[in-house]
Each structure stands twice: as structure tokens, then as C-alpha cells.
Amino acid sequence: MSMLPTFGFTQEQVACVCEVLQQGGNIERLGRFLWSLPACEHLHKNESVLKAKAVVAFHRGNFRELYKILESHQFSPHNHAKLQQLWLKAHYIEAEKLRGRPLGAVGKYRVRRKFPLPRSIWDGEETSYCFKEKSRSVLREWYAHNPYPSPREKRELAEATGLTTTQVSNWFKNRRQRDRAAEAKERENSENSNSSSHNPLASSLNGSGKSVLGSSEDEKTPSGTPDHSSSSPALLLSPPPPPGLPSLHSLGHPPGPSAVPVPVPGGGGADPLQHHHSLQDSILNPMSANLVDLGS
């Protein structure tokens, strides 16, 4: 263990100081310590020093320097998780500044696709939502047997997957929510399908496109054609008024020339106009006699 020239610490001691200051969150003090290190190439290639430089660059917003450090040196797997977080968070922050709004899940996914992790801090295994496929496989296998793991089981799963207990809990909660939503959607579609198959009226309406209660356009009276059925047939087919009382229709609305004459049985081929006048006389004469009686 040799002392560094013109410096009071060994390389191992420098690495230890960097780790302690990082874990304690003393980023400003860590930055000053790194600045005080001598210009020794061997020292500055130490992995703990490089990781400390990356942390300081991130907190100072010097993302270009951060990317340069992460891409230029091969880091040990036990440091990958920490450095991957720095890489992704830095790109998220830059994207949010560029767009002027916070990123959602889709936006973060697009950033990850656009700026994949460098192989210097990534073992090449595909990740999903920052979970390795091996971890997801373990969680899926456990979920198939028990969707509600106990706190002790969650701790065991966290150790087996390299995740935190909170990450394991959130994964199971999100998976249960997705499954419940899928089941509700499938149940709704099944109910709609059953209701349509058991309703013949709805099926006939959907098939023919016409209402069962509606009539066709050909059965309706054409516009502009006079409707004789509302006047003279109603008058002619109504029962005659009792003796001594005038007809209500004859007082207010005497039949006009549009009235349709009704053939008199046994009349043969009588003139319709002559029959029309005789019909008027048969209605008006009793009324006139009644008026004379009332006047006397």
C-alpha cells in the first residue's frame, strides 16, 4: 500500500472516502474532494473515483460529462444499477426541459428507446420497466401460484430478484389491477353478446333496418292530395240525427262539393249530382221544419 505522491492518502483510502461521501449524500463535499486529488492517471481510473465523478456531474447538471464518463469506462456489474439510474434520469430531465412538461410513462419509454443504455453499464440483457427479464420471470412464476405474497415472501422475492421489497409489492399490485381490468372487460363483452342473442326484436331491427311498428312510405297519403276520408265519408256514414234535432255537422260545416256521393240501393245509374242535391234536401228539410216549429 503505497502513498500517492504529494498526497496523504492511498488509492484504497481515496476510494473509501468517495464511497462514504456518496452514501452520506455529501455531494458538494465529494466534489471538493475530487477536485483536490492529484493529477494521477492511475488514481482517476479507479472505479470508485469514476462513479463519484459521475454522481457529481449528475447533481451539477453536467450531463455531457456524465455521459462521457459512463460510456468511456467499463464498470463492474454491482455498480450497473446505480449508474443506469443516473443515465436514464439525466435523459428524462433533458427531454422534459426540451418539451416543457413532465414525462409520462410513454414519454419515458420513448426516451429509453432513443437513448439505450451503453454496454459499459449494462450486461446486454433485455429490461422491461427497468426490471430484468430474469426478475420478471421469477415474479410471474410466483404470481401464477399466489397473487398475494406475504411480507416475508416479498422479502424473499426481493432477495431472489435483486429488487427492493417496495418494487416487488408494486409489481404484484399492478399485475392484479391489470388482470381485474381484463376480466371486467371480458365479462362486459360476454354480457353484451348474450343480450343481443336473446333479443329477437333487436336482432330483427338490426337485420332489416326497419321498425316493426312503422309503416312503409307507400302506405302514407301523398302530400298535396286532398283527404276526402276526413270530411264527407265521416258525415255520410254517421247515424242520422234524432227527429227534431239538427245534425251537429250540418249546423257548423255543411257538406261541400267535395263530398263523395254514396250510391242509393236500387237507384241504378242515377246522376251523382242529382243524388247529391236530393241528399242535401233530405237533411235540410227536416231541419227547416224544426226551425219553423221552434219559431211558432
UniProtKB/Swiss-Prot annotation:
Residues 124-183 bind DNA. One of its GO terms (biological process) is mesenchymal stem cell proliferation. The keyword Nucleus applies. Induction: Down-regulated by CTNNB1 upon differentiation. Activated by TLX1 in the kidney and repressed by HOXA2 in the branchial arch and facial mesenchyme. Gene3D superfamilies: Homeodomain-like (1.10.10.60). CDD domains: homeodomain. The keyword Nucleus applies. Disruption phenotype: Six2 knockout heterozygous mice not exhibit any obvious abnormalities. However, Six2 knockout nullizygous mice die soon after birth. It is found in: Nucleus. Residues 179-190 have a biased composition (Basic and acidic residues). Expressed in phalangeal tendons, in smooth muscle and in head and body mesenchyme. GO terms for molecular function: DNA-binding transcription activator activity, RNA polymerase II-specific; DNA-binding transcription factor activity; protein-containing complex binding; RNA polymerase II cis-regulatory region sequence-specific DNA binding; sequence-specific DNA binding; transcription factor binding. Keywords: Developmental protein, DNA-binding, Homeobox, Nucleus. Residues 168-284 are annotated as: Disordered. Residues 254-264 have a biased composition (Pro residues). Residues 191-206, 228-237 have a biased composition (Low complexity). One of its GO terms (cellular component) is nucleus. Belongs to the SIX/Sine oculis homeobox family. This is Homeobox protein SIX2. It comes from Mus musculus. The gene is Six2.
